[in-house]
């Protein structure tokens, strides 16, 4: 990824398309026209051009980069083990929920290895804690807006080798 700062006079829909925004872009009334982290398509680029701004900060995705949502989805799928499912994405985090009543088992060593990777965060309830169906037992998050696919692949391999980082038995 590469960070760029675009001046309004140099901006066009073509120049904006594909960029990832570093912050919300608002119209004159204060309404968000394009949210932080959005990867601009033609329609979003046109909306951004219609908003009042002088300089726009964004990220250019390069080959081998993943957007935070795609990377987070992959992370979440790798983290879940037996008795846990990916529930949904909200607030930049993927919720992981129990599919049955039981005790939460956390693979602590692999979890520590995963969390040692810059830009990756997986946080859980306590190992051995009783949980109910539908209860969120962990959350997975990719903190940068764009991350190297290699980092995500390493984490996937660690989590899968452990049979998932969180399980309900």
Where is each model-derived feature located?
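N-terminal glycine-rich anion-binding loops that anchor highly charged ligand groups
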Residues: 14-24, 38-53
